[in-house]
A protein has these predicted regions:
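Hydrophobic faces of well-ordered beta-strands that scaffold small-molecule active sites
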Residues: 16-22, 47-49, 77-82, 117-119, ...
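Histidine-acidic metal/acid-base catalytic patches
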Residues: 3-6, 11-17, 33-35, 40, ...
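Acidic-and-aromatic substrate-binding clefts and catalytic sites of carbohydrate-active enzymes
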Residues: 25-30, 50-62, 85-98, 125-129, ...
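Catalytic domains of carbohydrate-active enzymes, especially glycoside hydrolases
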Residues: 33-53, 108, 112-116
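Alpha-helix N-cap and loop-to-helix initiation/capping positions
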Residues: 34, 57-65, 93-101, 130-141, ...
Length: 334
């Protein structure tokens, strides 16, 4: 008598939560409830309100309403803010001191049901005239000042490697010196290239500190001035994003892998000009060599044609995100 066929094994549970960073929908001008409805249609488990503008306001009743709406749809909320570094060119002093701004966000995160507050130091502009170390020190001081309040709220602050401000080793230093008991990383896969860094090195360095993430693909290639970088839809780049996502799922189980869809025209990094290096004097040669290996494998990408009108731009923005979400879901079996 033939043996009975074995029962089909249950599929393994997803090791990461598929999320959407609402910067992906920055041009839609939707309410937080419309953003949640759209995210639910894409089967997102986490919605990352990376800036205050996306959640509408920090009024307690609004935050409670958004929380209820998300919970009814089985969605986890993360909230965030922009610069918390008083010496950064991005910092908005009109909104109060950095400590006051973080304090408001910690209160808001509690009301909204977010386990973290995402924040940034600044951007690549803070590397000029530099040094970036002074801004790191400024941010560390602020974070130490809010440690007690963060711990009282049982919340953590996720600092992003943002817009070319810090390489992985610099963000690691910021986290360690601020206090890794309440500060971690919002790991972005596209921004490392704006600091001449291999995104895989960024992941290797920061994965022990990851609280949440932004993911998108990138295309990098050599140009006469140095290298060019474009952010692209998932699967269209040359940074081995499939391997990156699988590695993230292995190293950061249970964390959100949130799509931050941004499709850009090429940005040139003119590293053949000696003046360029005034902003990047601390970049290790061995790390830069890894970046060059990626660029050497790349092929030039033509600039994307501009949308014919704002509505066409909004439609393309949605199409870019939907394509990246679908690609990533299939890749990881989410």
């Amino acid at each position: 008598m033939a043996a009975a066929a074995p029962l089909a094994m249950a599929a393994p549970a997803p090791t990461v939560k598929l999320g959407i960073d609402l910067f992906s929908l920055r041009s839609q001008n939707w309410t937080p409830f419309q953003l949640l409805d759209y995210s639910a249609k894409l089967a997102a488990k986490v919605v990352h309100f990376s800036e205050i503008r996306f959640i509408g306001s920090l009024e307690p009743e609004n935050l409670r309403s958004v929380r209820r709406y998300a919970e009814e749809r089985g969605i986890e909320i993360e909230i965030g803010m922009r610069s918390i570094c008083p010496t950064s060119k991005m910092f908005d002093a009109k909104a109060g001191t950095a400590e006051e701004q973080i304090g408001r966000m910690l209160d808001s995160a509690t009301l909204a049901g977010s386990r973290i507050v995402r924040a940034v130091l600044g951007s690549s502009e803070d590397r000029r005239p530099g040094p970036i170390e002074k801004h790191i020190e400024s941010t560390i001081k602020v974070l130490r000042n809010v440690r007690a309040k963060a711990q009282d709220h049982n919340l953590k602050i996720a600092i992003e490697n943002h817009s070319g401000d810090m390489q992985a080793h610099e963000l690691k230093q910021l986290i360690e010196e601020s206090g890794k008991d309440f500060v971690g990383a919002c790991l972005d896969s596209g921004n490392p290239l704006w600091t001449l860094e291999d995104p895989h090195l960024t992941l290797e360095t920061l994965h022990p500190y990851v609280l949440t993430s932004h993911v998108r693909d990138s295309s990098v290639w050599r140009v006469p001035e140095g290298a060019a970088v474009s952010w692209v839809r998932m699967g269209q780049g040359n940074v081995a994003i499939d391997e990156y996502c699988r590695k993230y799922a292995e190293l950061c189980p249970g964390r959100a892998l949130s799509m931050e869809s941004i499709v850009t025209n090429p940005r040139v990094f003119a590293f053949r000009d000696p003046k360029f290096w005034e902003a990047y004097r601390d970049v290790p040669a061995w790390s830069f060599a890894r970046f060059l290996e990626i660029a050497d494998r790349g092929q030039p990408r033509a600039a994307e044609p501009r949308p014919a009108n704002p509505e066409a731009g909004r439609q393309r923005e949605r199409e870019d995100l939907e394509a990246s979400v679908e690609y990533t879901r299939k890749l990881l079996g989410l």
